[in-house]
Amino acid sequence: MQINEIEGERQPVLMIVVGRQRVGKTSFLNAVAQFLRAHGAAFQIWDADKMNTTYNMSVFHRDARQPGSDDPEDVKAWLEERFIDLVEHRFDAMLDIGGGDTPLARLVQDVPVVATLEDEGVRVVLVHVIGPELADLDYLERFAEDDLFAPEATLIIMNGGLVLTGRSNDVAFSQVSEHPAVKAAIRAGGVVVRMPRLACMSEVTDRELSFEDAIKGKPGVDGRPVALFDKTRVRQWWERELPEMFELIPSLWLPQMRLGELARPPISTKRARKARKAAKPAGDESTSLGTD
């Protein structure tokens, strides 16, 4: 049973985030996890980023599961166990694998992970988080060339938080938007979306606050809340700009939301095609995601 044969059917979603170091993978996944859970989604979080010990998913999500060992072969075996568990028990999951030569890359070399999971009715969603540098496309190019880890459900996230202050997003992402690897991914069914910038991201994450707690003015680990106007910035980003981003992502590519207006019917094929045209970033009106 192939994913593209049952486009209208909801399947267990495995969202895997990849990219170079310091492009904002964990920041993206943390924001997405918080937003989806705030809208009623239920899923497991797998934190296999062993290189990032100070800012990882386990800091913000106490239920995140981690491998018991840092040894790459142990982590590889742990990932295989998680995948089997997902197939058997049919739940959604998000995986933060980190950067570099990851255990996931080693597993992919051993077995066709995507094809195996898709044959078992799991929708594998590969998320490439990139900044405006061409080198940020290394993972996308490599996976596409090898054809080992290139599912149809490929999401390219252009991290607006990596654009220098005062620079136009259109200009900043113009080269990567026109890159052959990005265009090939779109032709293959991929979707390109820009993550809106939250200028005070570090003010929230350094305090180990959730975005909702930051809006409510709750104190962080340092005993202080975010500043007054930063609270307003977070509210605008959380309540207006993030929902706009999610509207461009096919709903079947995400864990199912059950609360609020974003718990919408699956995105139509026609609308999905429109979303793919988001490869050309929006202008400066949005406000940034941090780095890993």
Describe the residue ranges of each PLM region.
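Hydrophobic anchor at the beta1->P-loop junction of P-loop NTPases
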Residues: 17
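Conserved lysine of the Walker
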Residues: 25
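Hydrophobic positions on the alpha1 helix immediately C-terminal to the Walker A/P-loop
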Residues: 28
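Short beta-strand-centered segment that lines the nucleotide-binding/catalytic pocket of NTP-utilizing
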Residues: 40-54
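Switch II (G3) loop of P-loop NTPases
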Residues: 91-107
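Conserved catalytic-core segment of NTP-binding enzymes
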Residues: 103-196, 201-204
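Beta-strand-loop-alpha "switch" segments that mediate conformational coupling across diverse proteins
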Residues: 175-236, 240
